[in-house]
Amino acid sequence: MRIILLGAPGAGKGTQAHYISKALDIPQISTGDMLRAAVKAETPVGLEAKKVMDAGQLVSDDIILALVKERLKNADCSNGCLFDGFPRTLAQAEALKKDGVGIDHVVEIDVADSEIITRMSGRRVHLSSGRTYHVLFNPPKQEGLDDETGEPLVQRADDEEDTVRKRLEIYHNQTAPLIEYYSGWASESIENAPRYRKIKGTGSVEEIRDRILGVLTSC
């Protein structure tokens, strides 16, 4: 079973990807990890990618797709895989289809922007320990201070509301064509079309996990 998981920053995609990978015993495939591994192993594709990166250029879709096809040949992908952060663009999705890389399921974790902004902008971190709090959902005993050390908590730059809004705007601009592409393809009910599901991304981590696994295992 090959799965693409879509979700905005803060939608819980990383957490759910871990659960899905473990429950279905399939690897979670990240293009970043693949790229680093191929460069380190000095595979032909890895050497080509290194040459591009050393020149300060972006790795092309052709190289990324070659990495994906190379990775899918590994034994641990025999029962499928979960794509993490791929495809990112409509061009990559179309290239997958053109090259005959089948996808069984596309799952979108749907969370309103307002909810994501609340989730992310409310995070506070104790930098030296990594302990994380939330001003609404998991507040420290004393406002602004770490429970164990009493040291100040900080808001990471990535969690500032303006930054979150910009990240969401980029996500929607980039992902809307992907959602339209896969949902449209799925609705055609033709052979080899993936199943597309939009899953409510609010509730407990376990509830969301069960919703996703429910649609993946009911077919």
Curated annotation (Swiss-Prot):
Name of the featured protein: Adenylate kinase
Record's keyword terms, sorted: ATP-binding, Cytoplasm, Kinase, Nucleotide biosynthesis, Nucleotide-binding, Transferase
GO biological process, one term: AMP salvage
Domain of life according to the entry: Bacteria
Function: Catalyzes the reversible transfer of the terminal phosphate group between ATP and AMP. Plays an important role in cellular energy homeostasis and in adenine nucleotide metabolism.
Lineage start: Bacteria, Pseudomonadati, Chlorobiota, Chlorobiia, Chlorobiales
Region (NMP): 30-59
Family affiliation: Belongs to the adenylate kinase family.
Pathway as given in its UniProt record: Purine metabolism; AMP biosynthesis via salvage pathway; AMP from ADP: step 1/1
Protein residues bound to ATP: G10, A11, G12, K13, G14, T15, R123, T132, Y133, G203
Main location group: cytoplasm
Record localization: Cytoplasm
GO cellular component terms given for this protein: cytoplasm
EC numbers: 2.7.4.3
Subunit structure: Monomer.
Catalytic activity of the protein: AMP + ATP = 2 ADP
Molecular function GO labels: adenylate kinase activity; ATP binding
Residues where AMP binds: T31, R36, Q57, L58, V59, G85, F86, P87, R88, Q92, R156, R167
Residue span of region LID: 122-159
EC category: transferase
Pfam families associated with the record: ADK, ADK_lid
Domain remark from Swiss-Prot or TrEMBL: Consists of three domains, a large central CORE domain and two small peripheral domains, NMPbind and LID, which undergo movements during catalysis. The LID domain closes over the site of phosphoryl transfer upon ATP binding. Assembling and dissambling the active center during each catalytic cycle provides an effective means to prevent ATP hydrolysis.
Disulphide bridges, residue numbers: none
